[in-house]
Each structure stands twice: as C-alpha cells, then as structure tokens.
Amino acid sequence: MENTTDPENIPVSKPKYPTIRRILSQTFRILLLFSITTAYVLGYQALCHQGLLITFGLYGAAMLLHLLMQGIFANLEIRRIEKRDGVCSFKKTVALTITGYQENPDYLRQCLESCKGMKYPKDKLKIILVIDGNNEEDVYMMEIFKEVFHGEDVGTYVWQENYHTWNIPSEESEDSSSEISSFPWKNEGIQMVEELVRTKRCVCIMQQWGGKREVMYTAFRALGTSVDFILVCNSDIKLDKMATVELVKVLEDDDKNGAVGGDVRVWNRHDSFISFMSSLRYWMVFNMEIACQSYFDSVTYIRGSLGMYRNDILQAFLEFWYNKTFLGTRCPIGDDRFLTNRVLSMGYRTKYSHKSCAYAPCQYLRWLNQQTPWARSYFRMWFCNAQWWHQHHIWMTYESATGIFFPFFVTAVLIRLMYSSSLCNIVWLFLCIQIMSLLLSLYASWQSKKLSMVLMSLYSTLYIIWLLPCQLVALLTIAKSDWGTSGRKKVVNNYVPLFSLSIWAAVLLGGLCYSMYIGCRKDWSKPQANRELYHLLYGCAGYMAYWVLMTVIYCVSGSCCKMRSQAVPQTHDITSLSVSLLV
C-alpha cells in the first residue's frame, strides 16, 4: 500500500477564531507569570502570626490551590475512565514497535514474552523489534527474539545500512534532503525491510547504529499505512496483557483522540531506595499530573514506554519529526515528547488511560543520568508547545507556564533562606516543604489505597538535592545534543551528573554553615532571640519526628513486600490483605 506522507491528506482539527485564542492564551500566560513573580518579590503574606511563627504567603496559597485543583481533576478523569462502557471492536490493526539498543538480555526476554502474551487477535497485531546496531555484539538480541517467537510468523533481517545512510544514485545526490526523504529510489535493503514488516507478523531488524529516533523512524516508515494504530514501547518494558486493548478503546472512542498513553510502573521497586521512590513518583506523575492533563484532552508528554498513535496522523508528520532541529542542530533527545507535540500541533487530543499499564526497571546511576536529558527535552519542547496552546484548553497554558518557572522560584527561595543567617528560617522552610508534601502524599495514599504512598512526601527532599540541579544544568546546556546514556547490557559509568550535584551541595552547605556561624555569634539571651531559639528547637524536634516516622513506615513497607513475595499466591487471609494495603 502506498505510504501517505502529505499532511494535507489528514484532517487537522483547528479551533474557531485562532488569532483571538492565540492572543488570549499569550495574555493569560503573561498575566499569570507577572502575578506569581509579584507575589514572590513583594512577599505578601495572606496569613501571619508572630507568636506561633506562622506565615502563609500568596505564593504558597497559589501552590496549595494548584495541587488541590490538580487532584480534583485527576480524580474526575480516573472516575470517567472507570465509568466508560466502551468495548474494543478488535477490528483495528495495531503494530507494536520496540526500540532496542544493547539491552539487558533478561529485560529483553521479559519484554518480548509480555508482547507475545498480549490479549489481542494475532491477525490484527504485528510485533516489530528494531535493533540500533548490526555488529556481532548486537546479535544476541535477534537470537532472543527468534527463541521467544519460535513457531510464529517470523521475519528477520540484518541491514548493513539504515534509511538515511544508503547510497543515493549520483544524479539524485545533488537534490535537497527533502527529496531524499521521499525515497524515489529504493535499494535492496529498504525493499527487504518494508516487505518483511508488511507481510510478516513478528519482525526483527538489525540496522546500522543511528540513535533511537533512527530505529523508530525505520519502524514507522516501513509500516507505511498498513496498520491503523502504532503502539510504541522500549525493550526493557514488561507490558500488561490488556495494555493494547485498553489503548485501542480510547482511540476508537473518539476520532479526535490522536494519541493515548498508559500507566508506567516500576517492577523492581524494592531493589533500592531510589527505585522505591521512583515507583511512588511514577504513580503521582501518571495518576495525578497526567490524569489531570487528560481531563482537558491535552497530555503534553506520552512516554515512549507505553504510547499509542493514530498511524495516519503519525505518517503525516513523520519526516518533519525526524528532521527536527533546535538552534540549528539536530535533536537526538526528546523523540517521544516531540511525537506528542506534533499530535497536539495538529489540534488532536492526547489522552491517558490508567487501565493500560507497563512495568519498567529503575537503577540509580542510570536514573540520575537520564534526569538532565529529560529535563533538557522538556525545556526544548516547552518552546514548541507554546505555539499550540491556543488550540487546546486553557489548562494547558496554565500548567505549562507555571511548570517552566517552578525550578527558578524554588532555587531563589532556597538560596535566599540558606544565606539569611537564620537557622530558624532554614529549619521551618524544610519543615513546611515536608508538611505540604505530606498532605499531598496522604491524598495519594487515600486515592491508591496504599499506606506506602505516604512516603511520597520524601520526594520533595529528593527533588531539592538531586533533581533540581539537574534541571538547572539542563537549562544552561539546552543546546547540547548528546543523550548521555547507554544500553543496559553495559553498566552505566557516566559520573558527570555527580559533578553538578557536588556544586549544588556545596552551595547549600555553604549557606547552612554561614547561618550556623552567625547563629553561634548571636546573643541568645535577648527575649526576641530566646523566642526564636524556642521555635528553632521545636521545629527541629518536629522535623526529626517526621523522619523517624517515615523511616519506620519505609522499613515496615519493605518487610511487608518480602512477606507478600514469599506468601503462597492461593492464600487470601487477613495477613495478606493487610500487606497489600501497606505496599
């Protein structure tokens, strides 16, 4: 079937009065930023009690209101999904595309086995693995693919090139890149790849290394318009057997739904503290932040771990997506985020379904190395998304505007108070941060019916110490194009992110030492200083009590998880019920 790549062949959903909506959207963004900045600079206090040393600023009130609205809309979206009576027609053809690069063999096998066990008609589901590399060290991935899908309709091919490295005939080599992308000439490799992808059900392609975007492009381009929907996932993901069905339901529900993402969870959550906190953070991101965005039909980032797109829309912007540049250089990061951006730019809705889920592993150094590239792609796509805010709900403008400036305000607050020469201010700053996080975590615990979600309040400390400097570095190096990670077969040994963490730690510790030095020289015998010392002491006591409580809950949660893993699956007694509520 001929591939359709002309965007004019795809209906674009445009809002009424686009110019007026654009003006209103940008005006709202400017007023919002001005209001938040003014409230912070002037330090206006909505509530103040000198005796109890309590102040509640306008900025804090706005943050509390934001979290409240986010929780309400997310809850409404989850309820709407639960009440939806949609039934999958099982008539749509789906291609499950997997991108792989030197993957851990165990992770890859689990991924492929989960794909094989997918509850979707085999005649309607294709499984395509594209391996980024065709050397001897990459062959093991194809061998695993053959083992898992032995007996299926399998096709494999080792391609010595890729779509953008094969030799163009000399008479065509002088033409522009846009003409090359239309491929008027097709060599034997391209023809073989496209024939396998369109005629076989399970296909594995090894091609010349070119990065994640290159392997994604190969799968998308080779499929052409042969399927209705394209499901993307990474080679370390374990898919739930109903993941495809639930995503197809959403796209079938409304033709204006251009893409939909699923719920990604961490399956090795108790391997380390970082993996445990990541699992809690994943729940919060997907079931609060993304669910809230889905309520307004404008999910700004559908993860590459589990996302489905309408193929006709994807084919329309495929070449533009592949050739995307930033500040004149090609962007090898943010491939999945830019896919979502292109769907939004055409006026289509982007949705989320918590009923479709997948499981991903988490390791500390890899997690740390990914934070800066992820943040960098977020800042880049923010500038792109700003062009399409007017096509969607005003919530998209509001959330994007507040999200981009949040790291700056947090940094300013931290540095100002750390160097304020007041230990009392520092202690109560962190105590208030934990109290706010605890309130949010209690809501998440109630929503998820798991006591362990209370530990999500610890994420605020993790954000301040580890993630905030990564975001600042990402903004300062926004033009940098390297990805910074490697395949899981090799242990990640990139310690560069630790350098930025060291600088940030030095800044915070410097402020703390300065305030302690001033405090040691202070005359605490005066009545005002004596009252401040009293507040400092019970603030420290409250902060220590919080950490003791969180430590106990974490230890109990870990013990309960081990009990559940050792329990017999058929046993359903009161003990197993209490364990499930804890973890």
From Swiss-Prot:
Keyword Plastid: no
Disulphide connectivity of cysteines: none
Extracellular side: 51-52, 415-425, 479-497, 557-583
Any one Pfam family match given in the protein's UniProt record, by short name: Glyco_tranf_2_3
Superkingdom of the source species: Eukaryota
Coiled coil feature spans: none
Record GO terms (molecular function): hyaluronan synthase activity
Alphabetical GO biological process terms: extracellular matrix assembly; hyaluronan biosynthetic process; polysaccharide biosynthetic process
GO cellular component: plasma membrane
Bilayer-spanning residue ranges: 30-50, 53-73, 394-414, 426-446, 458-478, 498-518, 536-556
Residues in compartment: Cytoplasmic: 1-29, 74-393, 447-457, 519-535
Membrane topology classification: Multi-pass membrane protein
Subcellular localization(s) per the UniProt record: Membrane
Family: Belongs to the NodC/HAS family.
Protein name, per record: Hyaluronan synthase-related protein
